Amino acid sequence: MSHKGWHSRNYLPHFDSQDVVQFVTFRLADSLPVEALQRLENADRPETLRHELLDRGWGACWLRSEPIARLVENAFFAFDGQRYRLHAWTIMPNHVHVLFSVLPDASLGDTVGSWKRYTARHANQHLGRTGAFLAN
């Protein structure tokens, strides 16, 4: 697997390499209201502000539910040691932080994407809902 090095999806730079420990945050789709997203567009330090805003606990906060939080953990545990090495994580009411290292035959994008797809699909099933569960 070739790693991309520095790249961006138009909003956050990423460094895809097996040689670095990755810190990734992903959030529920409703975790930031429109006004907060507008503030982020103009912020000097958007990542600092993003974390401050997420910690306000906006949205449905489905991750506060133990069964939903366990889905996130199950996603993390699924390929630990095969595609990545999981170092640490914390599950907040409306977002997740995870610290991990990507292994040679996996990529950052595929790894995070698989966690998000698994979590969204199973959480929506558990909650009896459809639609966006996690933000892009």
List the predicted regions and their residue ranges.
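Short catalytic/metal-binding and nucleic-acid-binding patches
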Residues: M1-N136
